[in-house]
Amino acid sequence: VITEHGQVVNNQDIMVVHLHLKEGETIAPHNHPGRQIFFTVVEGEVEVYLNEEETYPLVPKKVLDFDGEARISVKALKESDIFVYLVVKR
């Protein structure tokens, strides 16, 4: 059972990051070249912005899948628990 935050798995194929964001907290725009990203909210609600043009509201049971070349930023609309899976493209 994964309970700690930060990078919880990091090997040659995948990185898994567990994040906890307080309401109103943001993640600045960045990208992950060479990776396919799967972004899922376990608890709470966030808005994910891709390339500063597309907005995706995410709640539990929803997964956003996108190319790591895209620039992502995030804003927590409620206190949120998030898992991000960064899979190496082959």
Residue map of PLM features:
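A generic "binding-loop/recognition-motif" signal
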Residues: 14, 23, 34, 54, ...
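Short beta-strand segments in beta-sandwich/barrel cores
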Residues: 17, 26-27, 44-49, 63
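Short, surface-exposed secondary-structure edge patches
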Residues: 18, 38, 53-57
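Glycine- and acidic-residue-biased ligand/ion/polar-headgroup-sensing regions
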Residues: 34-46, 51
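A cytosolic small-molecule/anion-sensing beta-strand core signal
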Residues: 42-43, 59-60, 78
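Short acidic-glycine-tyrosine-enriched beta hairpin
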Residues: 52-69
